[in-house]
Amino acid sequence: MEKKVEAILEFDKIKKQLAEFASSSLGEQAIYELAPATDFQVVQKAQLETEEGAKIIRLRGSAPITGLTDVFAHLKRLEIGGDLNGLEIYQIGSNLRVSRQMKNFMNDLLEIGVEIPLLGALSDELLVLKDVEEDIAISIDESGKILDTASEALSSIRRTLRRTEDRVREKLESYLRDRNASKMLSDAVITIRNDRYVIPVKQEYKGHYGGIVHDQSASGQTLFIEPQSVVDLNNERKALQAKEKQEIERILAEISASLAGWINEIHHNTFILGRFDFILAKARFGKALKAVTPHLSDTGIVHLIAARHPLLDAEKVVANDIYLGEDFSTIVITGPNTGGKTITLKTLGLLTLMAQSGLQIPAQEDSTIAVFENVFADIGDEQSIEQSLSTFSSHMTNIVSILEKVNHKSLILYDELGAGTDPQEGAALAIAILDASHKKGASVVATTHYPELKAYGYNRAHATNASVEFNVETLSPTYKLLIGVPGRSNAFDISRRLGLSESIITEARSLVDTESADLNDMISSLEEKRNLAEREYEEARELARGADALLKDLQKEITNYYQQKDKLLEQANEKAAGIVEKAETEAEEIIHELRTMQLNGAAGIKEHELIDAKTRLGKAKPKTINKAIPKAPKQKPHVFQAGDNVRVLSLGQKGTLLNKISDKEWNVQIGIIKMKIKTTDLEYIEPEKPKKQRIITSVHSSDSPAKSELDLRGERYEDAIQKVDKYLDEALLAGYPQVAIIHGKGTGALRTGVTEYLKNHRMVKSIRFGAAAEGGNGVTIVEFK
């Protein structure tokens, strides 16, 4: 992908913000080297890594990555046999500590069943060198200073050195306490010159202490003298310092030699930790943006839900739905230069670069974005400044370059296509450029203020119009993208709001050609209907949410009912069994007494009568009643398939299987509600046997109410479905083999609803969108059985 587009879409600013979430220079370096990938599998893996990082952040808040340092230069010096200083060795030790902590951290997550396979595999590559880490920890502190615990010899040298220094200070302090000190010394302090302890003596008393003069003050009035009495002690101290230095060098050389045996392992650990830092930075950035992991498409499909430009204030930016690649591959955003059109282009372009770089995007869940081989953008006139060309020449030079490189895996963003020249010629060029881009198979989003391009979205099957909503009350754009609605000029409305005379406005309107005026009136009407539809849609969503909540409550109550019923039945069984058992016991006693009487010679009592009596008592004991959720009657096993009609046993409702979630669960459409239902709670409903086909003699009369097409444009969803249902009956009675249902392109909501209804109609054999001559995807052709 070309670097130029990253600059145009300000991807560098995204990387700068992302770098703030890195914990190390290694993470920052990986971020600044980040570039959008074009291979679908690579992008998919990068997105999964970020999602796993986000899962870790959600579960643990952070990861033990702090303390990671770039030690690659240190390792290179070890490779050529050099020794490291204390700070460099400490930094390697710190990386080894982070490696161990990170591996333990990841193992803990994996042990509790957290699904992070990619990052789990990454942590498996970390090698724990605990002995090496501990050797460094007991030898060097975080400032790089060698600790006394580094060796017994160093500890002994330093103990002797401290005692020697104490003796020197003690001797010099005795001079400071002398009663003549105030007279002979410039100041009662011990200081150091040339790394030897000295005292400040006035010039005139320099011979009193003997010894060596190491320095003097600027005025020459004070001499810094090492008295003769401490010269030997200072010499001893210097010798000990030399031994200390020698031992430190030996320790550093020894540790460096030890580390040289683990260069490859330390190098790999550091690289892996850098990857972890990079991935976790992406996850933290996504959390800060309130971003989501998008679904990826390798067929050019884009469906962004409530997408936001990541560089704009999240509290103020207007979220927009942007969809492309299914019903149309070209969007032409028309309307006046009131702002918002270019932001839409940049939002789509920048979110595409982010997604292909493995970043989450600021949009709602279930958003889909395509993976392109190249993203091209002609936005702004930065070239004209560089090359001293006119705005038009600048844009045209860029467009020529784009058309030479573009293919079916490309996204092109044209801003103000055809601008900077004669409007009529500019509009014609814009149309030709859009057609050329489509022939190359590219996905295109273009903005323009030329009204001539409004027709482009209507007379090209691959294209649709769009606009940015403008509020004439506030005289400002709302920045709401309206796909399917072309832009219109608001000049007359704005002028009226600003106080221009009505007579002038009326005269101006008369000068506008009828076709343009009708088009603007049509667009205005479409906008009003769209706003109404959006309000009704939101109301319907609210009702659906309420119905869903009610259904859940009902399901809960039904479950409670059956549980309570089972409990009561069980209690009744136990009570009844107790009563009968008691009766049996009493009967046994009676029978025993009767048999005793029989043995004693009592007449009239037969043995078989005793047995019959006991059998009848045994049968009186009630059987256990097992009844919970109704179970499906035994029948030939049926393998459920999408589209099957079923009965939901726990609800007693009929529904249709939509798709299989797992072997144990299905998505079921019950009326207007879609629910997850367990397979064991489903009973298959056999389809009705087809009735014997009747031969229908079609008699067409001039006053027959049924026509060969039904126009639903402008209808509400519920009204439209009722009309379709009634119309199909009339068309069947009239004997039509096929009919056309016109629903328009629009947002696709009505088209989708009608299509779903037709798929489930018992008399519909097949459905398809119309050919270009029949109205394209604004018309559905229905063939009857």
From Swiss-Prot:
<keyword id="KW-0255">Endonuclease</keyword>
<comment type="subunit">
    <text>Homodimer. Binds to stalled ribosomes, contacting rRNA.</text>
</comment>
<comment type="similarity">
    <text>Belongs to the DNA mismatch repair MutS family. MutS2 subfamily.</text>
</comment>
<dbReference type="GO" id="GO:0030983">
    <property type="term" value="F:mismatched DNA binding"/>
</dbReference>
<comment type="function">
    <text>Endonuclease that is involved in the suppression of homologous recombination and thus may have a key role in the control of bacterial genetic diversity.</text>
</comment>
<dbReference type="GO" id="GO:0045910">
    <property type="term" value="P:negative regulation of DNA recombination"/>
</dbReference>
<dbReference type="GO" id="GO:0004519">
    <property type="term" value="F:endonuclease activity"/>
</dbReference>
<dbReference type="InterPro" id="IPR045076">
    <property type="entry name" value="MutS"/>
</dbReference>
<dbReference type="Pfam" id="PF01713">
    <property type="entry name" value="Smr"/>
</dbReference>
<dbReference type="InterPro" id="IPR046893">
    <property type="entry name" value="MSSS"/>
</dbReference>
<dbReference type="GO" id="GO:0043023">
    <property type="term" value="F:ribosomal large subunit binding"/>
</dbReference>
<dbReference type="InterPro" id="IPR027417">
    <property type="entry name" value="P-loop_NTPase"/>
</dbReference>
<feature type="domain" description="Smr">
    <location>
        <begin position="710"/>
        <end position="785"/>
    </location>
</feature>
<dbReference type="GO" id="GO:0019843">
    <property type="term" value="F:rRNA binding"/>
</dbReference>
<keyword id="KW-0238">DNA-binding</keyword>
<dbReference type="GO" id="GO:0006298">
    <property type="term" value="P:mismatch repair"/>
</dbReference>
<dbReference type="Pfam" id="PF20297">
    <property type="entry name" value="MSSS"/>
</dbReference>
<dbReference type="GO" id="GO:0016887">
    <property type="term" value="F:ATP hydrolysis activity"/>
</dbReference>
<keyword id="KW-0694">RNA-binding</keyword>
<dbReference type="InterPro" id="IPR002625">
    <property type="entry name" value="Smr_dom"/>
</dbReference>
<keyword id="KW-0067">ATP-binding</keyword>
<feature type="binding site">
    <location>
        <begin position="335"/>
        <end position="342"/>
    </location>
    <ligand>
        <name>ATP</name>
    </ligand>
</feature>
<comment type="function">
    <text>Acts as a ribosome collision sensor, splitting the ribosome into its 2 subunits. Detects stalled/collided 70S ribosomes which it binds and splits by an ATP-hydrolysis driven conformational change. Acts upstream of the ribosome quality control system (RQC), a ribosome-associated complex that mediates the extraction of incompletely synthesized nascent chains from stalled ribosomes and their subsequent degradation. Probably generates substrates for RQC.</text>
</comment>
<protein>
    <recommendedName>
        <fullName>Endonuclease MutS2</fullName>
        <ecNumber>3.1.-.-</ecNumber>
        <ecNumber>3.6.4.-</ecNumber>
    </recommendedName>
</protein>
<dbReference type="GO" id="GO:0072344">
    <property type="term" value="P:rescue of stalled ribosome"/>
</dbReference>
<dbReference type="InterPro" id="IPR036187">
    <property type="entry name" value="DNA_mismatch_repair_MutS_sf"/>
</dbReference>
<keyword id="KW-0540">Nuclease</keyword>
<keyword id="KW-0547">Nucleotide-binding</keyword>
<dbReference type="InterPro" id="IPR000432">
    <property type="entry name" value="DNA_mismatch_repair_MutS_C"/>
</dbReference>
<dbReference type="InterPro" id="IPR036063">
    <property type="entry name" value="Smr_dom_sf"/>
</dbReference>
<dbReference type="InterPro" id="IPR005747">
    <property type="entry name" value="MutS2"/>
</dbReference>
<dbReference type="GO" id="GO:0005524">
    <property type="term" value="F:ATP binding"/>
</dbReference>
<dbReference type="InterPro" id="IPR007696">
    <property type="entry name" value="DNA_mismatch_repair_MutS_core"/>
</dbReference>
<dbReference type="Pfam" id="PF00488">
    <property type="entry name" value="MutS_V"/>
</dbReference>
<dbReference type="GO" id="GO:0140664">
    <property type="term" value="F:ATP-dependent DNA damage sensor activity"/>
</dbReference>
<keyword id="KW-0699">rRNA-binding</keyword>
<keyword id="KW-0378">Hydrolase</keyword>
